[in-house]
Amino acid sequence: MSGVIAVYGGGGAKAAAHLGAERALREKGLAPIGYVGCSLGAVVAAALALGWEPAAVEERMVELGRRRIAVVDPLIFLLGIKRQSLLKPGPLRAAFEALFGGARFSDMVRPLTIAVTDLDSGDLVLFGAHGKDAPLVDVLVATCALPLYFPPVVIGGRRYVDGGIRSVLPIESALLFAPDRVVAVDVGPGFDEAPATSGATLPALIEINQSSIGISMAQGTLDRLDLWKLTPGRPPLTYVRPRVEKNATFATDKLRAYAEEGYRATKEALSAART
């Protein structure tokens, strides 16, 4: 497939940076012809693949950001570790249903691949283009089901969780499109993250879990980028790393700022790629 494939990685609210990245790509005449998405990056990619304009997606994300999506499951205080997650999955699903309704992968204007993790096999599983078929909302809830926060999602008898557990920036999946160029926008955990400047302090158990998973995700991304460079015959990869903060998964008050940072970082990366 001739053209640019965009890989929009996971990062919670920071995934709004993908909207700025999309805007920068289109301004340079590099509008993606297909998308690979993971976690909330898959939500952004799905909206764009359906043909929505970046500005419209940003408005919808800001609107959804005002909803109470992170709702603590009250039974956690009664049953403790017998529960599957800290948060109720219903509000997250309701938000995605409000955004996408009954949309399916077959409705996409441009092809979309979403990465999820099979909790039992540990495999990275793809849905959509070059992968399995399932209702779009089910797959989006699954790829956003970060363990501890949200429970696994059962699709076709298999338990799936956040795609970022296996690959928060699934660049290899872009190769299935046989693209001329890949642009990967990384808003996931990294060893370059700045300390959080605002927001409530996380409880110790959650902070330790989040930091531990983040270390694994960050190293996994570095390993994949190194492998890409060392593997002959792969298309050019433009890596975009917006400036992000730690513990900003639910920082929905910063969506517009993240979108602008994605725009800045993508313009900078595209300029550097020409030199």
Residue ranges of each PLM-predicted region?
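Patatin-like phospholipase
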Residues: 1-38, 46-275
